[in-house]
Curated annotation (Swiss-Prot):
Belongs to the gyrovirus capsid protein family. One of its GO terms (cellular component) is host cell nucleus. This is Capsid protein. Pfam families: Gyro_capsid. Keywords: Capsid protein, DNA-binding, Host nucleus, Host-virus interaction, Late protein, T=1 icosahedral capsid protein, Viral attachment to host cell, Viral penetration into host cytoplasm, Viral penetration into host nucleus, Virion, Virus endocytosis by host, Virus entry into host cell. GO terms for biological process: endocytosis involved in viral entry into host cell; viral penetration into host nucleus; virion attachment to host cell. It comes from Chicken anemia virus (isolate USA CIA-1) (CAV).
Length: 449
């Protein structure tokens, strides 16, 4: 006989097969009987195309000896890209570079720590810095500066992809580390993060909430679509086969990108095998021979395009993404925000513990903190964002584009995201010296010096 329990407003529960079941009785809130609206059908329809949480089960793992909860709260600005044009930038095509209003926000502890960097007179808000952060000093050698930071390097153009969302974010961390600025004035590495956590490990990711609002119009129709995905289920495309051919994360297309017949083989695939994010080569109508005669030809120039691919507006919409309309196209209210909530580890295997510092490591170095030893940069969830427009390039599939421009004294954000995240660290070690130093008292048994 199943145990039963009653709750207010006619809710009825029964305990069987190890858990409580809601019997879903009709509501008793109103005078007349109303059947419950079948809202789950709409959710089931969306999950048939994309399920952000395919399911999980709990694994019986030992609870930590002690825990510490870490909270993050802040804002992320999704801005348009900037460029510092030089003669050597993209082979002289710096004036013809275009970007798309896309973004990718990864939920991992590493990028949340980078988003809560120190705020100094040289802030990380506004994009990449020309060099590593300089707290004080103006000498050319690193050893002559405090705290031993490098000056901006010459002949380098600062750049970053839209996946580096933490560069345009302001995040607060609780509890705070009062010695973080003096210990890590520069951008923290995995080695620095491992030293800051010490013996703590990531026990679980509790919850992360996103609230996205479109802030800029792009014509008469420009909603911002956002979709939350589990882990790296929809990650960028990467070919290690051509790893030596896409330095600086840029590549050049070759024929037959435009559908023509090439007279030589290239490293690109035919048109039927290209994914939609790859742009076609712009055609060249006229050319000049060695004798100075201008002739017409059937050739095409090589288009520069980024190796990092993102979800287009049409793709996100087809997968059931939410839309947020900018002010002017819809009145601003709570419904103007896209709300996303990520709970748990986002892992169908139910794994809870994650290694921040490899076990048995006395001196934390970069070699120990590299993958797969450390899981600081393990992605639990990923939020994909793209803004649509009624006028776009065909291979962008409704995604808004813009021309890269020189930096000005203000940034141009097309969306803002409010973030709240809760993490929990754990420690398995018992705080007893006779347990930790057991080997020191027993290593000489039977052979005392």
């Amino acid at each position: 006989m199943a145990r039963r329990a009653r709750r207010p407003r006619g809710r009825f529960y029964a305990f069987r097969r190890g858990r409580w079941h809601n019997l879903k009785r009709l509501r008793r809130r109103y005078k007349f009987r109303h059947r419950r609206r079948q809202r789950y059908r709409r959710r089931a329809f969306r999950k048939a195309f994309h399920n952000p949480r395919p399911g999980t089960y709990s694994v019986r793992l030992p609870n930590p000896q002690s825990t510490m909860t870490i909270r993050f709260q802040g804002i992320i600005f999704l801005t348009e890209g900037l460029i510092l044009p030089k003669n050597s930038t993209a082979g002289g095509y710096a004036d013809h570079l275009y970007g798309a209003r896309v973004a990718k926000i990864s939920v991992n502890l590493k990028e949340f720590l980078l988003a809560s960097m120190n705020l100094t007179y040289v802030s990380k808000i506004g994009g990449p810095i020309a060099g590593e952060l300089i707290a004080d000093g103006s000498q050319s050698q690193a050893a002559q500066n405090w705290p031993n930071c490098w000056l901006p390097l010459d002949n380098n153009v600062p750049s970053a992809t839209p996946s580096a969302w933490w560069r345009w974010a302001l995040m607060m961390m609780q509890p705070t580390d009062s010695c973080r600025f003096f210990n890590h004035p520069k951008q923290m590495t995995l080695q620095d993060m491992g030293r800051m956590f010490g013996g703590w490990h990531l026990f679980r990711h509790i919850e992360t909430r996103f609230q996205l609002l479109a802030t800029k119009n792009e014509g008469s129709f420009s909603p911002v679509a956002s979709l939350l995905s589990q882990g790296e289920y929809l990650t960028r495309r990467d070919d290690v086969k051509y790893s030596s051919d896409h330095q600086n994360r840029w590549r050049k297309g070759e024929q037959p990108m435009t559908g023509g017949i090439a007279y030589a083989t290239g490293k690109m695939r035919p048109d039927e095998q290209q994914y939609p994010a790859m742009p076609p080569d712009p055609p060249i109508i006229t050319a000049t021979t060695a004798q100075g005669t201008q002739v017409r030809c059937m050739n095409s120039t090589q288009a520069w395009w980024s190796w990092d691919t993102y979800m287009s507006f049409a793709t996100l919409t087809a997968l059931g993404a939410q839309w947020s309309f900018p002010p002017g196209q819809r009145s601003v209210s709570r419904r103007s925000f896209n709300h996303h909530k990520a709970r748990g580890a986002g892992d169908p295997k139910g794994q809870r513990w994650h290694t921040l510092v490899p076990l048995g490591t006395e001196t934390i170095t970069d070699s120990y903190m590299s993958a797969p030893a450390s899981e600081l940069d393990t992605n639990f969830f990923t939020l994909y964002v793209a803004q649509g427009t009624n006028k776009s390039q065909q291979y962008k599939f409704g995604t808004a584009t813009y021309a890269l421009k020189e930096p000005v004294m203000k940034s141009d954000a097309w969306a803002v995201v409010r973030v709240q995240s809760v993490w929990q660290l754990g420690n398995r070690q018992r705080p007893y010296p006779w347990d930790v130093n057991w080997a020191n008292s027993t290593m000489y048994w039977g052979s005392q010096p």
